[in-house]
Swiss-Prot record:
Cellular component terms per the entry's GO annotation: nucleus; transcription repressor complex
Entry function: Sequence-specific DNA-binding transcriptional regulator that plays a key role in neurogenesis and neuroendocrine cell differentiation during embryonic and/or fetal development. Binds to the consensus sequence 5'-[TG][TC][TC][TT][GA]GGG[CG]A-3' in target promoters. Acts as a transcriptional repressor of NEUROD1 and INS expression via its interaction with cyclin CCND1 in a cell cycle-independent manner. Negatively regulates skeletal muscle-specific gene expression in endocrine cells of the pituitary by inhibiting the Notch signaling pathway.
Alphabetical list of InterPro entries matching this protein: INSM1/2, Znf_C2H2_sf, Znf_C2H2_type
One GO MF term attached to the UniProt entry: chromatin DNA binding
Record-given protein name: Insulinoma-associated protein 1
Region Necessary for interaction with CCND1, residue ranges: 43-56
Compositional bias segments (type: Low complexity): 209-223
Disulfide-bonded cysteines: none
Compartments in which it is found: Nucleus
Length: 521
């Protein structure tokens, strides 16, 4: 909230016209007649009603005796009343009360406490806060002062006029405390502070220790101690090295003292030294841009395919695809018809191609470390079966080029593609129903080819039955048949992809059957 947003009401009083009731005037006249002893007569004020009966003399005598005992303890005589009659009761109260009007706020110093109680009570305050109905203690105090003045000098007056214009201190809550203070005397207790004098009557009085140590109202505030927040910040700065929030812990420095700079000033962040070549730099940016000669790029090369990795874990994951599988000796032995194909060896020797860095995740039927996938036409060895099939396809294309020109063959499928074959040669596959072209497309051969290629070892056969018989006898350990259809695969990942693609519902049912059934409640 901005400063000065709330408007405070001023405590200064403004002159207000008011009228004193007639009943109070009659009571004041009755009190003046026995107490003043005819010392001073005041013109009566006409009242609309009959006057009340005078109080009994016993009550007046008791009031005079109590007030005389209270004034006997006071250290000095009461102040002399102002001379002259005060007959004006209407209009501006300054005409009837010529004493200067004071502000209800108390000064900073305590000089006003040295005055007498009645002088302070009658001169301080504003007529606006005067009581229309004075309390009995105030009436007794006014009557006693008049009696004392009459007995002492003979020309005194009673306090009835002053009671009509009494300040706010003669209210119900403070009249008895003021009378008790006057009866106690100034030396029996500590004087009242300005804050205690301005405190409303309903609140409890402040303890003596608080009153004695209360600073002045407008005095400059003493400089307070350092804020605890700043102290907390300094405390946190000391604990930066062991901050549990960062998750780090800075270890202690070396035992020997660090070397100082040439200029003599200390570096706030320490020395910027390369930990490998021990070279020192002026700032952290120069150290970051420094390329140490000892830092070399470490390469992890696969011994099977010469593929390079930057992490040993990646190389270990890659080498799982290079598990050596023993190839039967019958597959390594050359076929008798290999001599008849010697002419095609020179023609198709340059057409073969091999990838330098093949992908490790696609094929799992890789050869051993020596590359035992050998072509029977040209005795060329390959690390992977897919490379051998691609090479054999080039041999077949070269053989067909000598005869009728065949149509362009489809691109060679990967090793995990489907290869459908059945248990016996008498059974007919669905692919053969539409002709030999589709089956040849699966094998990567043209429709006009009269030989059938073994997908594992690359051997060619003149008929489909001979190829299936060869696969059953020699490559039964490397065949992965499908559980839901007669298709057969030569790699476990190929079979897994086939099941996920072609048999997702059956695979899901198998997984659910493996989970134990919960008994019904």
């Amino acid at each position: 909230m901005p400063r000065g947003f709330l408007v405070k009401r001023s405590k200064k009083s403004t002159p207000v016209s008011y009228r004193v009731r007639g009943g109070e005037d009659s009571d004041r006249a009755l009190l003046l007649s026995p107490g003043c002893g005819g010392a001073r007569a005041e013109p009566p004020v006409p009242s609309p009603g009959p006057l009340p009966p005078p109080p009994p003399p016993a009550l007046a005598e008791r009031a005079h005796a109590a007030l005389a005992a209270a004034l006997a303890c006071a250290p000095g005589p009461p102040p002399p009343p102002p001379p002259g009659p005060r007959a004006a009761h209407f209009g501006n109260p300054e005409a009837a009360h010529p004493a200067p009007l004071y502000s209800p706020t108390r000064p900073v110093s305590r000089e006003h406490e040295k005055h007498k109680y009645f002088e302070r009570s009658f001169n301080l305050g504003s007529p606006v806060s005067a009581e229309s109905f004075p309390t009995p203690a105030a009436l007794l105090a006014g009557g006693g002062s008049g009696a004392n003045g009459a007995g002492g000098g003979g020309g005194g007056t009673c306090g009835g006029d002053a009671l009509l214009f009494a300040p706010a201190e003669l209210k119900m809550g403070t009249a008895f405390s003021a009378g008790a203070e006057a009866a106690r005397g100034p030396g029996t207790g500590p004087p009242l502070s300005p804050a205690a004098a301005l405190r409303p009557p309903g609140k409890r009085p402040a303890p003596p220790a608080a009153v004695a140590t209360e600073p002045p109202a407008k005095a400059a505030k003493a400089p307070s101690a350092k804020k605890p927040k700043a102290i907390r910040k300094l405390h946190f700065e000391d604990e930066v090295t062991t901050s549990p929030v960062l998750g780090l812990k800075i270890k202690e420095g070396p035992v020997e003292a660090p070397r100082g700079r040439a200029g003599g000033a200390t570096r706030p962040l320490g020395e910027f030294i390369c930990q490998l070549c021990k070279e020192e730099y002026a700032d952290p940016f120069a150290l970051a841009q420094h390329k140490c000669s000892r830092i070399v790029r470490v390469e992890y090369r696969c011994p099977e395919c010469a593929k390079v990795f930057s992490c040993p874990a990646n190389l270990a994951s890659h080498r799982r695809w290079h598990k050596p599988r023993p190839v039967p000796a019958a597959a390594r032995a050359p076929e008798p018809e290999a001599a008849t194909r010697a002419e095609a060896r020179e023609a198709a020797g340059g057409g073969s191609s091999d990838r330098d860095t093949p992908s490790p995740g696609g094929v799992s039927e890789s050869g051993s470390e020596d590359g035992l996938y050998e072509c029977h036409h040209c005795a060329k060895k390959f690390r992977r079966q897919a490379y051998l099939r691609k090479h054999l396809l080039a041999h077949h294309q070269a053989l067909q080029a000598k005869g009728a020109p065949p149509p362009p063959p489809p691109p060679p499928p990967p090793a995990e593609d489907i290869l459908a074959f059945y248990a016996g040669p008498d059974e007919k596959a669905p692919q053969e129903a539409s002709g030999d072209g589709e089956a040849a497309g699966v094998l990567g051969l043209s429709a006009t080819a009269q030989c059938h290629l073994c997908p594992v070892c690359g051997e060619t056969f003149p008929s489909k039955g001979a190829q299936e018989r060869h696969l059953r006898l020699l490559h039964a350990a490397q065949v992965f048949p499908c559980k839901y259809c007669p298709a057969t695969f030569y790699s476990s990942p190929g079979l897994t992809r086939h099941i996920n693609k072609c048999h997702p519902s059956e695979n899901r049912q198998v997984i659910l059957l493996q989970v134990p059934v919960r008994p019904a409640c």
